[in-house]
Amino acid sequence: PVYGGIVLSMERFKRIIEIDERNFQAVVEPGVITQVFQEECEKRGLYYPPDPASRGSSHLGGNLAECSGGPRAVKYGVTKDYVLGLEAVLPTGEVINTGGRVLKNVSGYNLTQLIIGSEGTLAVITKIIFRLVPLPRVKKVLLVAFNALEDAVAAVASIFQRGITPSA
């Protein structure tokens, strides 16, 4: 850490408290490994799209602190797009709950989104409520070689113009 700073490990906060298949939501602690969470969701036909390159070792709380994304962000968005609410501890020691288990929450300031991406400077996240989506029924991998960068750019533009949004 920077001189005078501290390192706070949340790795023991690693419970997946609930995966609610009916409402497409999950409640987790910040020390859950991203890939472990994704696999548990997929066992239930649900999908948590954010896929940072470090998903095999990154913790969900760290993903929120940085608002991580990954290649699938093109289609699905980044971490902040899947957070419905938080439990967090402020520097004063006060425990707060932000957001909630509803898809549209418009009461007051959006403290959830303020904390996401703040890299731990505003609060320590202790619980996360995620929105999930249905697991895609079909996944196809396509690898295409181009002779020139301009051809690749034109192909990508053509794909988007046809209304197709690739996941990466």
Protein language model regions, located:
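Glycine-rich N-terminal segment of FAD-binding domains in flavoprotein oxidoreductases
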Residues: 1-13, 28, 49
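FAD-binding subdomain of flavoenzyme oxidoreductases
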Residues: 15-167
